[in-house]
Structure formats: structure tokens, C-alpha cells
């Protein structure tokens, strides 16, 4: 995972050491390196509870940290450089095809652990956040509130980055890699929400 962590840091993306699968330990109820019985997110969470302070976009620091934990997954904190819209894998693939057909610009898109991740522009923590952060329409648009299978990862959250794996399936992979974006800005999340919400609704029906 070292090469992946260093590559993300070189993009200016903060990276964090992640927990990792424990071989065949799933049958014993200990599928995660954190050794917590019944871990709710096996191999899909940071190694340390201090992950927000430990996040780094320095390639040198990333290389040093993964040199000591080469098996660690790569965690990408959200709400800093990007947010992530997270939907079930099938719905995400259908939505991506619809966006391409409609000429809707998309950014990096990854898949893994039965989910599809759409990387979008972040809202970060603007100076006037107190005016809108608790507002349902701005913080969690109606589409998100009504579609329980659609998650919006923003500040204080994170996602598992390819080629990390949670032990339940194959490693994550990019459908549209960051390097393929050619310097284009990340899309506005709101522009993608309607298509993603519709795709999630179709999957549930």
C-alpha cells in the first residue's frame, strides 16, 4: 500500500493509516487488525483515533508511515480537498453511465466493498458555516435525506481508497482515476445528486 499512499499524498490528498484484514480471522469474529470483537467496519477505519491530526499530504511522511505499516489500508479524509458521494455499487455504475450519456462532468470514481464513490468538490469549513451547516437543504439536501443508501462524506469523515480491501471482497479500484482528470476541477456535488438519488431509488424498487 506504500506506493498508493505516496501517490495520493503527491496529489495533495491527505492520507491516513488504515486498519487491515486479518487473514481468515473472520470466522472467529475478528476480521480486523484492530482486534475488536465484532468490529462494525472491519479494515475500513483508521488505525488511530487521532487520525484527523495524523493525516498528511507530505509524500515523504506517507512513505515513512507505511514503511512501518506496509499492510495498512489507505484512508482518505473527506471535507478537506474533496467530499465523496457514496452509493451502492450497482446504483453507482448505472448513475455513471447516465451521467456520461447526458454529458454531465464527473470526477474520480472508485468502487469497492459493494459501493461506488464519486469524488466531488468539498464545501470544507467556510467562514459562514454557522449560517448553513445546520440547514437541512444545504448540509444534507432533500435527495440525501430521502435516500438512505446514499451517503455524503464531508468533514469529519473518510473513505477507503483503492487498492485497499476490507477482507470481504476484492481490492478497491478506480473506474475513473484521479490521474485521468487532466487538471479539471472536481464537480459540484449538487449536480450529481439527482442522478445518484434516482439510481438508488431504482435499485430499491
What are these language model-derived features?
Residues 1-113, 123-124, 175, 179-205:
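Signature for HUH/AEP ssDNA processing cores
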Residues 118:
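Catalytic core of tubulin tyrosine ligase-like
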Residues 112-115, 147-148:
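Short, surface-exposed, polar/charged, turn-prone segments marking secondary-structure boundaries
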Residues 122-205:
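DNA replication initiation modules
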